[in-house]
Amino acid sequence: CNACADVCPKNCITFKTDIEGFWYPVVDKDACINCHLCEKVCPIISPADKVIRYEEPRVFAAYTKDEEIRTDSTSGGIHSMLALAVYEKNAYVGGAVYNEDHTVSQIIDDDPVRLPEIRSSKYLQSDSTGVYREIKKKLLEGCEVFFCGCPCQVQALYKSLGNKEYE
């Protein structure tokens, strides 16, 4: 999820790709100050502090009535409709985009022109480096942010915010 690199005060974490194409963090031990922030934010090393359990399963189903958005989307267009509502409030939307080099990155932007890039599922690992830091900055400035990512990325964002809940 790359959250460890975002919270590292010494920027001493890089990522190496294994034979299967997955990224693994590499710590420059000479630069590391052993603050352990990387471990605290890691959803693997430090699992969720609280688990929300419901008595009954909570299931929702929906899709947009906007046929063009629904056709261009992979999940009924609900993400796009939520994002448009966020943009109308001059807030920020975060999500995955394809890059020119055929990789995928997480971004945060307040320009609705970027929505078609964010729309749709991306079936490969996305680079989140920098996005958690940027989201935290925007939240501290009082901005609203709508972030969409994989479960591990959402958990990493929550942990990088110090497990603080924002409305």
Q: Where do the protein language model's features map onto the residues?
A:
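Iron-sulfur cluster-binding cysteine motifs and their immediate structural context
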Residues: 3-26, 36-54
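Short, charged amphipathic alpha-helical surface segments
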Residues: 30-31
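Iron-sulfur-associated redox domains of electron-transfer enzymes in respiratory
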Residues: 46-167
